[in-house]
Amino acid sequence: DRGLAGHLVEESLSFLRRRAADFLGISETQNLLDQLEQVWPATVRQVVPKPVTVILLADVLRRLVEEGVSIRDLRGVLESLAQVAHAEKDPLNLAELVRANMRRALTHQLTEGGVDLEVVLLDPMIEDTIRGAISRTAAGSYLTLAPAAARDIVRSVQRAHESASAPSNVVLTQPDVRRFVRK
């Protein structure tokens, strides 16, 4: 039955898209680099293995893919890393910096080539609350927001989303709080 087969293919593709980061390891990253090096050898040699190891690059790519960010422009990813990797080694921060450099491609993806992008803009007071609840340790940064405050923030974003003239799945925040809002 073609309907069942089509549904099975769609479900399989959907699963693979959601879990794509699980299939991106060190070997796959090295394969991507080998392919890119055939076309852009100087770009690859400028970034890998110094200042970015294949292990670190795999971690950054995985984080981007987990968020649905296309890594099709691997050259652009490497060029972004070349600009910041000498000063930054945290894969979370590197992924955020690469993501910010890919803003045009992300916007194009979200607007499907259109001009307008409807967003929910996070209130600066909420951002300040989140910013104040970020704890930084040697092991990384984490959010120490009280559960009640977290629920209030989520409700506030949901209300803003529901009252928008054209509902959006995009919540616009300052870069330093974005990954905590995303969670």
Model-derived regions: residue spans:
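Membrane-embedded alpha-helical signal segments
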Residues: D1-K183
